[in-house]
């Protein structure tokens, strides 16, 4: 990395983190100082399981709310409950942290999630070089990742597990890949966009990768048996918790645009189209399939900015393959430019946001809206890019994807 690039990246990191600190100080991640709301329910749910209590119970929910708000949500009129909304096995990877006090566990979680995020960049690229270091630095300069680290959002854990499974499958380590894949389903909306193309690839090359599918099924049954033994009837309680959770979070982008009934129908069609596309492109590069899957899932699942770390997958694919797009391929070049403008714009927006925070109420409002707006712009450009590559692929790019796919098949 050149010195000038290193200086720019360092400035970008500093500006983005300062902006995020201003933002979190204004909105306050929790009403009670020292408590990060996103991580506490998972930690407390794990603790409840060790104490042989029901993590979905009203008592545990109220403990989460008192930790976050200083009182129950009902007592202060807050509609946002702090329920345990994970499947039971989501607690397994972090179970040792529940033996520690929350402050210590939270500190460990911060560094664990940061390491997993950095490793995910290298795992996606399949190599460790200066470009990977640059990608890592820019990843830690993105607001969604910064927020996830600030709040210890478990999405980073399950994203890291899913990408780790992806890398192991690509490297031919099928049984460890299956184990990590099952553990990553502790947050299904994060795991499924990665697991679907992995399963498609495994079924398409059944003789080479059948051990992955068999191991995935076997370990899933083992985990299911353990969860039922730990908490009988947990599925019913989990579904009830999810139903309550969906009442106060944002709907998917498709539902937001088209309304509940039409949006749900379109989402179903998009999901079926995704499965069909993955199968039709089953001989394509696995990272390309995962990138396409991620952008479609981002349209059809409830939209949360902190899940935008998933967009790292299509961004890495796009940047690593940008050189294959011919200069005269104006359509693809324009889409690539739009994606890069959205990326650079998100970092510039953070710098602008720092200034706006210290101006008028209108300035603060604009600064407040910047992170979500830039993520949507990036998502929009990625959706267009991936759809165009599926429908009207660049010839050089298509040839490279097929070659890369055959190369991976031989490893």
Regions found by a protein language model. Give the residues of each.
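Intrinsically disordered, low-complexity segments enriched in polar/charged small residues
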Residues: 158, 192-194, 214, 345, ...
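Short, surface-exposed, polar/charged, turn-prone segments marking secondary-structure boundaries
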Residues: 120, 126, 187, 326-327
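Noncatalytic linker/hinge segments flanking ATPase motor cores
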Residues: 181-182, 260, 339-343
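Membrane-water interface at the C-terminal end of transmembrane alpha helices
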Residues: 384-397
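Hydrophobic alpha-helical transmembrane segments of integral membrane proteins
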Residues: 92, 140, 184, 310-311, ...
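Signature aromatic-anchored transmembrane alpha helix within multi-pass, membrane-resident enzymes
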Residues: 7-12, 217-221, 326-350, 382-385
């Amino acid at each position: 990395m050149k010195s000038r690039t290193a200086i720019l990246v360092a400035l970008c990191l500093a500006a983005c983190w300062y902006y995020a600190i201003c933002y979190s100080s204004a909105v306050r991640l929790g009403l009670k100082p020292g408590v990060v709301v996103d991580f506490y329910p998972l930690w407390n749910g794990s603790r409840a399981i060790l104490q042989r209590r029901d993590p979905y119970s009203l008592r545990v929910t109220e403990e989460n709310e008192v930790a976050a708000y200083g009182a129950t949500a009902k007592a202060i009129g807050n509609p946002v409950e702090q329920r345990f909304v994970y499947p039971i096995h989501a607690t397994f990877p972090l179970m040792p942290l529940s033996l520690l006090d929350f402050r210590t566990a939270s500190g460990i979680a911060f560094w664990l999630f940061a390491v997993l995020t950095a490793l995910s960049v290298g795992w996606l690229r399949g190599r460790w070089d200066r470009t990977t270091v640059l990608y890592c630095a820019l990843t830690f300069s993105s607001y969604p990742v910064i927020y996830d680290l600030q709040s210890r959002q478990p999405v980073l854990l399950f994203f890291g597990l899913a990408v780790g499974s992806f890398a192991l499958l690509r490297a031919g380590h099928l049984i460890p890949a299956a184990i990590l894949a099952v553990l990553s389903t502790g947050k299904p909306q994060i795991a499924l966009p990665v697991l679907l193309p992995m399963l498609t690839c495994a079924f398409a090359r059944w003789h080479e990768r059948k051990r992955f599918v068999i191991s995935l099924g076997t370990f899933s049954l083992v985990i299911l048996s353990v969860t039922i033994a730990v908490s009988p009837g947990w599925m019913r309680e989990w579904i009830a918790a999810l139903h309550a959770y969906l009442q106060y979070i944002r709907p998917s982008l498709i539902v937001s645009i088209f309304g509940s009934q039409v949006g749900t129908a379109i989402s179903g069609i998009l999901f079926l189209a995704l499965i069909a596309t993955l199968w039709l492109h089953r001989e394509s590069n696995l990272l390309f399939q995962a990138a396409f899957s991620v952008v479609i899932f981002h349209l059809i699942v409830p939209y949360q900015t902190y899940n935008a770390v998933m967009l790292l997958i299509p961004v890495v694919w796009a940047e690593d393959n940008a050189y294959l797009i011919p200069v005269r391929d104006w359509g693809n070049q324009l889409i690539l430019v739009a994606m890069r403008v959205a990326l650079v714009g998100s970092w510039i927006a953070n710098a602008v946001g720092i200034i706006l925070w210290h101006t008028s109420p209108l300035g603060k409002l604009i600064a407040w809206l910047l992170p979500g707006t830039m993520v949507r712009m990036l998502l929009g450009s990625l959706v267009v890019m991936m759809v165009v590559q599926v429908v009207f692929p660049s010839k050089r790019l298509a040839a490279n994807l097929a070659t890369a796919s055959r190369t991976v098949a031989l490893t």
